[in-house]
Amino acid sequence: MIGVIGVKRNVDIAIREKLALYPKKHKKYVGELLNSFKEVVILNTCNRTEIYFNCTEEISEDEIFDKIFNVFNWNDDLKKYMFLSKEKRAVTHLMEVICGFHSRILGEDQILGQIKDAYKTAISDNSISSELQKMFEIAIACGKKFKTKCKMFEVPVSSVSISINSALLKGCRKFMVLGYGEIGKLAIKHLLSHKVECIYLIVRDKSKASDLEGEIVEILDFNEKNHVINEVDCIVSCTAAPHTVVRNEDIKTEGDIIHIYDLAVPRDVDKELSEKERVILKDIDEISKIDDKNKKIRKERMEEYKHIVEESIEEFLNWLKIREVSSKIRNIKIRENEICSERIKTFSNKGNGENAKLAERMIKSTADAYVNRAIELLKSEALKGSDSSCAEIIEKIFLT
C-alpha cells in the first residue's frame, strides 16, 4: 500500500513549527521508518512536512499514525492537524503538490526542486526501490512538463518575489538576507534585478557565496549581523535553523521603520519584535495573503494544463496494474521457451540439419504469435481491472 501522511493545508504556523523536522536527524528518521515500511521518502520544506511510504502488509490508519509519530516524537495531540491519503489519493496528492496546486503561493515552483532533492536523498539512503521510486520518477517528469507548458516564468510569483516586491513598493532600498539556501539564493537573485542600495548576505560559510561579493553585496557571518542589522530597512530571513536567529534585543527600539519578512518554518524571527513600533513583521502565512495581480493569471493557466497531472496519475496507476501481472508474463515466456525447445529437439532428431533450422524458426515464430497475443490480452484486462479471470484462463492454457 502506498500512502502519504502530512500536515493539513492552512494549519497555523505555530502548529507547523511543532511538526517541522530537523535535517541533521534525517538519517535517524529514515532508519527508524524503514523498520516499519518497505519504502520511505521524507519531504521536509519550510512550508511542508510529508512522509511518503509503501508497506507490504495490511496496516490500520491508527497504526500508521502511531508508527510515524513515534519516530518523530510528535505529541499525539497534533494528530488532528495531519492528513493521511492512500493509494490513488496519495498519488494524486504528489502530482498536484509537485505542480504547485497545494503551495501556499499558488503555482510556486520551488517545490519541484525540493521534491527532486527529496527523491535524490531517498535514492542515496536506499529508502526507495520499487513503487515509490517509479511514482516519484513520474511525478518529477510531470512537474517538469507542467512547468514548461505553463510558462510560469511569464507570471512570476513566490513568497520571495511577493516579499521583495512588497518591500520595494514601501520604499526599502537597504536589504539584509539571512540564509543562502534555495530561498536565499532566489532572494539575492531577485534583489540584484532591482536598483537597491545595498544587500547584506548573512551566511554560516562565506566561501559558499564568495562569487556574490561586489559593489552592493557584502557577505557577513552570523556573528557580524548585529553590526549592520539596524542600518537596513528590510530583512528577508530564510534559514533552516531550529532556533530564533533574529532576537528581540537585536533590533533597537528607536529608529526608522524596518520591514521583516520571515520565510522560515520554524520561524527565524522573534515574534515579540512585532510589538516594537518601528518593526513591521510578516511570517510566511501573512506573506501568502498579500495580494498579487499575478495570482489570478497563474490560477487560470494552471487549470488549463491540469490534464498533465491527470495523465501522470493514470500513467502510474497503469504501471502498477501491469506490474501486478508481470510475474505471470515472465512465467508464460519461460514456459514458451521450454515448449519450443522440446518441439525443436524432437524435430531435430527426425529431420536433416537444414529442415531443422527452418522448423526452429517456424516453431518459434508461431509460439511468439500466440504468446504475445495472450500477453497483450492479459495487459489489456489488467488495465481494465478485470485481469483475474483472464489470468486464470491463460494460466490453464500455458502453465498447466
From Swiss-Prot:
The gene is hemA. Possesses an unusual extended V-shaped dimeric structure with each monomer consisting of three distinct domains arranged along a curved 'spinal' alpha-helix. The N-terminal catalytic domain specifically recognizes the glutamate moiety of the substrate. The second domain is the NADPH-binding domain, and the third C-terminal domain is responsible for dimerization. Keywords: NADP, Oxidoreductase, Porphyrin biosynthesis. The record marks 93 as: Important for activity. It comes from the Bacteria. During catalysis, the active site Cys acts as a nucleophile attacking the alpha-carbonyl group of tRNA-bound glutamate with the formation of a thioester intermediate between enzyme and glutamate, and the concomitant release of tRNA(Glu). The thioester intermediate is finally reduced by direct hydride transfer from NADPH, to form the product GSA. NADP(+) binds at residues 179-184. It is an enzyme of class 1 (oxidoreductase). It comes from Clostridium perfringens (strain SM101 / Type A). Signal peptide: none annotated. This is Glutamyl-tRNA reductase. Its EC number is 1.2.1.70. Substrate binds at residues 45-48, 103, 108-110, 114. Belongs to the glutamyl-tRNA reductase family. One of its GO terms (molecular function) is NADP binding. The lineage of its organism: Bacteria, Bacillati, Bacillota, Clostridia, Eubacteriales. PROSITE patterns: GLUTR. It catalyses: (S)-4-amino-5-oxopentanoate + tRNA(Glu) + NADP(+) = L-glutamyl-tRNA(Glu) + NADPH + H(+). Catalyzes the NADPH-dependent reduction of glutamyl-tRNA(Glu) to glutamate 1-semialdehyde (GSA). InterPro entries: 4pyrrol_synth_GluRdtase (IPR000343), 4pyrrol_synth_GluRdtase_dimer (IPR015896), 4pyrrol_synth_GluRdtase_N (IPR015895), GluRdtase_CS (IPR018214), GluRdtase_N_sf (IPR036343), NAD(P)-bd_dom_sf (IPR036291), Shikm_DH/Glu-tRNA_Rdtase (IPR006151).
